[in-house]
Design a protein with these regions (language model features):
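Short amphipathic alpha-helix segments
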Residues: 53-57, 118-127, 229-243
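Anionic-ligand-binding alpha/beta catalytic cores of soluble enzymes and soluble regulatory domains
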Residues: 144-225
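Short, conserved charged micro-motifs
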Residues: 26-31, 87-91, 121-125, 148-154, ...
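Glycine-rich, small/acidic residue-mixed loop/short-helix segments
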Residues: 183, 188-195, 205, 209-292
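Acidic, proline/glycine-enriched N-terminal capping motif
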Residues: 1-66, 73-74
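Short glycine-/aliphatic-rich beta-strand segments at the starts of folded cytosolic domains
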Residues: 12-34, 106-120, 216-226
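Acidic, low-complexity central loop/insert segments
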Residues: 10-12, 18-19, 68-174
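Short amphipathic beta-strand starts and helix->beta connectors
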Residues: 1-7, 56-67, 99-101, 123-131, ...
């Protein structure tokens, strides 16, 4: 089901939750063995090329964090950025697996900031990591740059609610809010965009291969909608009759008197357009907008 809103144009200023610099002779081989996406195309490209988007998984294949990995100035320099996954989490996850690798990880999050241009982006100065992000707008471009640098902001300033509405309408999960340590990538359809099945070994790869062979999971992240105000506290459990079938994990006002959200629900006990409640046996309060 498609959900359409009027598409704004302008800019949104934000701070990355993580911006890490990874250097050393073993940087590529180390990251390649930890990241769910293939980094060889990134390493072969020049600085300023598109990054790889992927996941940092646990041994059991659960989602610990996500991120974009960028090529730096040299073949042994990479940068890791994330909208929502925090730098200490990613750094601890990586450093926990450094054994004899010649790799250094620096947290530079506080020194960098971000901007999203919605619509036409202006020319980008040298030193800005510009890329096609995961915002959900038909046309947008992200940039991450040092706080002491200057970039052009084109058009009107967009608020967080507008950006969040586009993300949720496009069913793009925020990691770890919508898909986190208790979830498999496939449950949020992240396997389609954030996982390589051909790159070879990485942490969590065996689980991902088994999931691909199985072809299905028991839960799915879907869009939901309701009338009135969004849930006051998240995550919010949802029920089909007396049975809890999932939880709403993110929500935003839809701009038309209701709200839109993402919920992780069981696909054994729910169907598209099902009416759900926020309490066991309670009144209908929301509807599934996608088939689980």
């Amino acid at each position: 089901m498609s959900i359409t809103f009027s598409t704004p144009s302008g800019f949104f200023e934000w701070s990355p939750a993580a911006w890490l610099r990874v250097t050393g002779p073993d940087a590529l081989s180390f990251l390649q063995g930890q990241f769910s996406q293939d980094l060889r195309p990134v390493a072969a490209a020049a600085r300023g090329s598109e990054p790889a988007y992927g996941l940092w998984l646990t041994l059991k294949g659960k989602v610990e964090a996500d991120g974009f990995v960028f090529r730096g100035e040299s073949a042994d320099e990479f940068w890791i950025g994330s909208y929502f996954s925090r730098a200490p989490v990613i750094r601890a996850r990586l450093e926990g697996f450094i054994i004899a690798d010649d790799v250094t990880i620096e947290d530079q999050t506080d020194a960098w900031t971000g901007i999203t241009w919605v619509g036409e982006a202006p020319p980008v100065p040298a030193g800005v990591f510009a890329f096609t992000g995961r915002r959900g707008f038909p046309v947008s471009r992200d940039g991450v740059y040092r706080r002491d640098a200057r970039v052009d902001a084109v058009g009107s300033r967009l608020d967080t609610e507008t950006v969040e509405r586009a993300r949720i309408a496009a069913r793009i999960p925020a990691v770890p809010v919508d898909a986190g340590p208790g979830d498999l990538p496939n449950e949020a359809d992240l396997d389609a965009t954030a996982v390589s099945y051909t790159k070879g070994c990485y942490l969590g790869q065996e689980v991902m291969a088994r999931l691909k062979a199985m072809g299905q999971v028991r839960r799915r992240l879907v869009r939901v909608g309701g009338i009135g105000s969004k849930p006051s506290a998240l995550p919010a459990a949802v029920f089909a009759g007396e049975r809890q079938v999932g939880e709403v994990r993110s929500a935003v006002a839809d701009g038309a008197g209701g709200w839109l959200g993402l919920a992780m629900v069981s696909n054994l006990h729910t169907v598209a357009n099902a009416e759900l409640a926020f309490s066991a046996g309670g009144a209908s309060a929301l509807r599934l907008l996608d088939a689980p």
